[in-house]
């Protein structure tokens, strides 16, 4: 994804993180889902099925938005087995790249696959697509029962919210300080285009499903360089847009619910330097969001967030400003105010190290945390990695 204008790079150390890998000896298992190979394999999502199977999806091909052979792939780890199935096709739109798949179950245990088909080989032309089924318990790929596009139409509230939130944001004194007003005005003006604001919304992270059954699917736009959510109150039959999550570069939201009902979004930084995770809060079940503020967590790639069954929050991402050679799992017992426990899952040297990114998290009934992410150690060694962590050991 693009960076816009970067004038100054300020590297601020993220204090308190040990540089050791697996210091708590919490890793139960780590494996490649398929043998590393040369095709680009990226953007995984994992779901635990009711029968105990694990299902993973990712996109794979000769590139990303510019490669029309990119398709959505998947693999299954059947309950009681130790090896993943051979990869199988999950979706392939003829003549278009398919990217950024997300898997989830609604409250009725219907399986959803949501992804983007990239029109015109531009992220801004992406269309949200979905497949659903209840026939997913057998070996191999799910048998899809329905396919459709997810169309959302942000209205005049989109325009007014962008204007109001940018006006509320404090000025900058570094990085984009000179250009921020021009940038803000550019986004305000672009928001008035009804066509542009109706397309180009992309998936990355699984949705948040509230106790009410409401599905909040986080989306982002490479054109507007900000985020939004698609909301469904009928188990995914229909969708409406939230108000935008406004900031200078907050994309790819990951969501978690506080005990008081507030929803917190952590987002990748696609804005000014230094790159830090953005944070926004919704107090009305995802309908509207505060303008984003930067946390002190370094990160310029996709992040994940998950509330564990012991109440702690899990954050996973690259705590770096200069690459993807390190991945950290951080745990919090105060809903993200502080991160007391930190465990490195990947920790290579910058020079000659691998690239690890775009994670997905779930916790299974046995309390184990399952993590999938993209792994590239050379141009001929690309795969999706699966790591199982016993978070009870991280204390």
Cite the ranges covered by each PLM segment.
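Positively charged n-region of N-terminal signal peptides that target proteins for export
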Residues: 1-4, 202
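Sec-dependent N-terminal signal peptides
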Residues: 4-13
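Asp-box/BNR beta-propeller blade signature and adjacent active/binding-site loops
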Residues: 19-395
């Amino acid at each position: 994804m693009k960076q816009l204008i970067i004038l100054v790079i300020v590297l601020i150390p993220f204090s308190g993180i040990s540089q050791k890998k697996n210091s708590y000896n919490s890793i139960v298992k780590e494996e490649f889902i398929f043998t590393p190979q040369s095709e680009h394999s990226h953007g995984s999502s994992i779901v635990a099925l009711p029968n105990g199977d694990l299902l993973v999806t990712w996109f794979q091909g000769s590139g990303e938005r510019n490669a029309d052979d990119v398709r959505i792939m998947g693999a299954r780890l059947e309950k009681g087995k130790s090896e993943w199935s051979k990869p199988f096709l999950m979706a392939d739109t003829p003549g278009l790249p398919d990217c950024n798949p997300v898997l989830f179950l609604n409250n009725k245990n219907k399986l959803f696959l949501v992804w983007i088909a990239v029109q015109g080989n531009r992220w801004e032309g992406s269309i949200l697509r979905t497949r659903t089924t209840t026939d997913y318990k057998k070996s191999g790929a799910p048998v899809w029962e329905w396919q459709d596009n997810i169309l959302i139409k942000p209205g005049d509230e989109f325009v007014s919210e962008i204007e109001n939130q940018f006006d509320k944001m404090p000025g900058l004194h570094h990085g984009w300080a000179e250009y921020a007003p021009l940038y803000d005005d550019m986004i305000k003006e672009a928001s008035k285009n009804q066509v542009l604001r109706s397309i180009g919304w992309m998936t990355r992270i699984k949705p948040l499903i509230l106790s009410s059954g409401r599905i909040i699917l986080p989306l982002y736009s490479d054109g507007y360089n900000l985020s939004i959510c698609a909301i469904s109150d009928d188990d995914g039959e229909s969708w409406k847009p939230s108000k935008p999550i406004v900031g200078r570069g907050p994309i790819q939201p990951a969501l978690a619910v506080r005990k008081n009902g507030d929803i917190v979004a952590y987002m990748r930084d696609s804005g000014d330097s230094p790159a830090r995770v953005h944070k926004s809060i919704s107090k009305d079940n995802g309908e509207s969001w505060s303008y984003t503020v930067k946390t002190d967590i370094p990160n310029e790639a996709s992040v994940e967030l998950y509330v564990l069954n012991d109440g702690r929050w899990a954050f996973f991402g690259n705590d770096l400003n200069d690459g993807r050679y390190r991945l950290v799992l951080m745990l919090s017992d105060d809903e993200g105010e502080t991160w007391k426990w930190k465990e490195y899952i990947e920790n290579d040297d910058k020079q000659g190290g691998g690239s690890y990114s775009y994670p997905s998290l779930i916790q299974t009934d046995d309390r184990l945390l399952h993590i999938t992410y993209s792994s590239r150690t050379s141009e001929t060694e690309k795969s999706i990695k699966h790591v199982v962590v016993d978070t009870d050991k991280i204390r």
